[in-house]
Amino acid sequence: MKKTALDIIEHAEEHLIEKIAENMHTFGMPSTVGRVLGIIYMNRKPMTLSELSEATGMSKTRMSQVVREMIDANIAEKVFEKGVRKDLYDVEQDYYQTFISLFAANWTKVVSKNKVLYKKLNRELSDLLQRDGLTPEAEEKVNQLLNELKEWLHYYDWLSRLIEFFESEEVFRYVPKTKECSSLK
């Protein structure tokens, strides 16, 4: 049986949606987030929770959780459309911006968590150095760990600057957006 043009189009869209869902794992996001991102993206206009629930087969409660996760990651937003009473959700149509949003959201969390851990460990180890009766071996190990923590902090500072490099879009001065795919031909 010969496929209709509509069948081929729907098949291609489904492949793209599935690939977007798979790619979300790279960013530490669940595939359900990627699936919803792909569905809204392919729809090319904002969608309601009911529409998304129907398109994914998920409950409205689960869909609400997924959309909230997407909003937290800055890859979706609630939008207003005159005459529509239900909440509408839309996604960034620019793949580059979606990448930057996901990259920044995930790495900002990592940086924040590790800076908190740095402060805690640095305080504990510095307090330990002030104690009497610390063996020379223990003191040496504490100093090694404190030096390691400084290197760690430098790394997370660099990572913070890298995030800013992407968020400011300065990255495009060095790695421009392309109009033609040179590497996929």
Swiss-Prot record:
<dbReference type="GO" id="GO:0003700">
    <property type="term" value="F:DNA-binding transcription factor activity"/>
</dbReference>
<keyword id="KW-0678">Repressor</keyword>
<dbReference type="Pfam" id="PF12802">
    <property type="entry name" value="MarR_2"/>
</dbReference>
<dbReference type="InterPro" id="IPR036388">
    <property type="entry name" value="WH-like_DNA-bd_sf"/>
</dbReference>
<keyword id="KW-0238">DNA-binding</keyword>
<dbReference type="InterPro" id="IPR036390">
    <property type="entry name" value="WH_DNA-bd_sf"/>
</dbReference>
<dbReference type="GO" id="GO:0003677">
    <property type="term" value="F:DNA binding"/>
</dbReference>
<feature type="DNA-binding region" description="H-T-H motif">
    <location>
        <begin position="49"/>
        <end position="73"/>
    </location>
</feature>
<dbReference type="InterPro" id="IPR000835">
    <property type="entry name" value="HTH_MarR-typ"/>
</dbReference>
<comment type="function">
    <text>Negatively regulates the transcription of the opuC operon. In the absence of GbsR, is also a negative regulator of the opuB operon. Binds to an inverted repeat in the promoter region of the operons.</text>
</comment>
<comment type="similarity">
    <text>Belongs to the GbsR family.</text>
</comment>
<dbReference type="InterPro" id="IPR052362">
    <property type="entry name" value="HTH-GbsR_regulator"/>
</dbReference>
<protein>
    <recommendedName>
        <fullName>HTH-type transcriptional repressor OpcR</fullName>
    </recommendedName>
</protein>
<keyword id="KW-0805">Transcription regulation</keyword>
<keyword id="KW-0804">Transcription</keyword>
<dbReference type="InterPro" id="IPR026282">
    <property type="entry name" value="MJ1563"/>
</dbReference>
